[in-house]
Structure formats: C-alpha cells, structure tokens
Design a protein with these regions (language model features):
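Juxta-kinase regulatory segment immediately upstream of eukaryotic protein kinase catalytic domains
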Residues: 12-42
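Catalytic-loop of the protein kinase fold
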Residues: 220-222, 227
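Active-site activation/catalytic loop segments of kinase-like enzymes and analogous catalytic loops
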Residues: 256-301, 315-331
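Activation of the activation-loop gatekeeper triad in protein kinase-fold domains
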Residues: 244-249
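N-terminal mitochondrial targeting presequences
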Residues: 1-9, 15
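All-alpha amphipathic helical-bundle segments outside canonical DNA-binding/catalytic cores
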Residues: 173-174, 304-315
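ATP-binding pocket architecture of kinase catalytic cores
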Residues: 47-203, 207, 211-220, 234-238
C-alpha cells in the first residue's frame, strides 16, 4: 500500500478541501470526545473540518477549533486489513517518549459509535515536504541537495539506534525470522496479484530466497522512509520537523529499511522507466548516488553495510509488487 499512500497525509503542502460526500464526521460526538480528552474547553465551539484531498489507505482530516489545529486519522468505513489505528497510535505514543521526529498523538478511540470507526488525534505538522508540486513552486538549488540528503538520513539512523524496550515498543514486531518472512510474504503477494507470466519475477523471487543474509540486526524501522514522508523546516534544510506515515513501523532488519529507501532513490543514470516511477528529486544534479547514501549510513552508524545488493533488490521487488497490485485492481 506504499503507492496508494504516496500523497497520503502530507500534512503540509497537501491540498485541503471540504469533506467528501459519504466521509463526513459526526461533529457533535467528536467535540464531546475532544472535550473529554482536554483538547477543547467548550462543546459549543465551532469545529472547522477540512479533509486532505489525497490519501486512500486512511482518511485524514484537519480540525480547526479554539485557535488550535489537530489532525484526525481514521480508516475508510468497512476497512479491516492494514488499517489498525490502535497499533499506529501505540507506535506513535511510544515514539513520543524518546524520538522527537514522530508526530505527537493526543488521544485514541476504538469505539465505533463516536464517528463510525476507530480513530486517533494527532498534532498538525507544519513545514516543507519535497514533492513535484513543491519543486514547481520553489526550485531548490543543486548545491542544497547535499545538505538535504544528509539531513534526511539523520532521523532514520536515529530510529535504528533507539531502544524499543525503553519506549515500550519491544512487542511491535517479531524480530526472529523477519527477513525470511518478508521475502516469503511479498512473494505470495506478487503471486496473488499476478496478471501475466513474467519470468523475471520468478527469477527474482528465487534469487531473494537464495541470497538472504544468515544473520542480521534488529531495530525499530519505519518501512516507508522516503521524501514525501519527511517534513523539513520551512526555514532550514538542516532541520526536520517530523517524519510521517508510521503505519508500517515494526521491529525488523534496519538494512531492509535502508534498502527500501535506496530503492526509491532514482538516479540520473537509471533507465527511464525507473526514473518515471519515482517523481522524487533524487535524480537532480547535486544529489548523492545510492552508493554515497550507503556510505553516509555506514559513517553515521559506525558499522559496515553488508549484502546491500540483496536489500536493494528486495526494495525494488517490494515496490514492483505494489505497482502490480495496483494494476491488478485496475485490470479487474
């Protein structure tokens, strides 16, 4: 579901609009909930609700009330798989205890009687997200990309160094067998969504099975760490205000996280198809190469990155499966 969320809750430069028909919130119930949780003082206050125009995996709204701005995240009605609001809230709540780049969460409700689905309330994140639209409005000088790419990497390294036990997140995943499960599960997902007989897909699945690392570290990982989930300060490329989209955060191999990130990192020398798939600024002159990103990661962690070809190929395969799933739904 990475691509279904590529413009999900970019809470900064995402277009906000009136709430779409059929996706309205029960404002009376919501205001009672906000007051009970100390987020507003009066139920009579006007609740200005806007909906973020993008986002298909989960629905995201902005609440403007009593000079405060909140964001509410909820799944679409009827959604089950991949929309665990409680898990996402607990991950963010834990991260709030020791990682200052995750959005602050204020309250969670698993009661369907309030607005029809479980939901949680989080802070409204401000700053700048580097998207194609943003680049059209404000060109970034080539000389800035070295700073930008270093700044972008810092929170990912910090996340991989966190102690999940101290944050109360040690049960957020099953570290043993993580790589094996990922390879197996993404292979299964591809086969379920296959529409054509693509021999290369079978070759890649076999290669991934045969080239898995025997040993690997475990840490908290984001699992979708890319430019449109990174909120920079509006005033400085050396500061990141927040990292978004934590619904796939788990405990796993940190190099899986890095591999997915560099899979999204298209370069000017890449084939046209690969560059067309990722409309990020990574191929613009001034950006480091994927190899340079890996070297930066090694320098920051103080540890060598081994078997990176496996992790990069897995990242590309995972993205290809997501594209195939989208095509499968379209083709039906």
């Amino acid at each position: 579901s990475h691509f279904s969320r590529r413009r999900n809750y970019s809470l900064v430069n995402n277009m906000k609009q009136k709430v779409r028909k059929g996706e309205e919130l029960n404002e009376i119930n919501l205001k009672i909930f906000l007051k009970e949780n100390g987020l507003i003082s009066k139920i009579k206050s006007d609740l200005g609700v806007l909906q973020f125009s993008n986002g298909f995996s989960n629905l995201t709204y902005q609440l403007n009330i009593e000079d405060k701005e909140y964001v509410i995240r909820k799944p679409p009605k009827g959604a089950v798989y991949g929309h665990d609001m409680g898990r996402e809230y607990k991950v963010l709540k834990g991260l709030n205890n020791g990682f200052n780049k995750a959005p602050i969460v204020y309250a969670y409700a698993d009661d369907n009687n309030i607005i029809g689905t479980p939901f949680y309330i989080m802070e409204k994140v401000n700053g700048r997200i580097i998207t194609p639209r943003e680049l059209k409005e404000r060109t970034i000088p080539s000389k800035d990309y070295s700073t930008i790419s270093t700044t972008r990497l810092n929170p990912q390294v910090a996340l991989h160094n966190l102690d999940s036990h101290q944050l109360g997140l040690s049960e957020r995943g099953t570290p043993a067998g993580y790589v094996e499960r990922q390879v197996r599960n993404w292979g299964k997902q591809y086969l379920k969504a296959a529409t054509d007989d693509i021999k290369e897909a079978e070759l890649i699945m076999n290669w991934l099975n045969e080239n898995q690392p025997k040993q690997y570290k475990h840490s908290l990982i984001h699992n979708d760490y890319k430019y449109d989930n990174v909120v920079f300060s509006s005033n400085s490329w050396t500061k990141i205000n927040s990292i978004l989209d934590w619904e796939m955060c788990t405990i796993g191999d940190p190099l899986m996280d890095l591999g997915t990130s560099i899979a999204y990192w298209a370069m000017a020398s890449d084939p046209k198809g690969l560059k067309a798939a990722f409309d990020y600024p990574t191929s613009i002159e001034g950006n480091p190469t994927r190899l340079e990103i890996i070297k930066m990661y090694e320098k920051q962690t103080g540890e060598p990155v081994n078997n990176i070809v496996f992790y990069y190929v897995f990242g590309l395969f995972k993205i290809a499966v997501i594209v195939q799933q989208i095509y499968y739904r379209y083709d039906k």
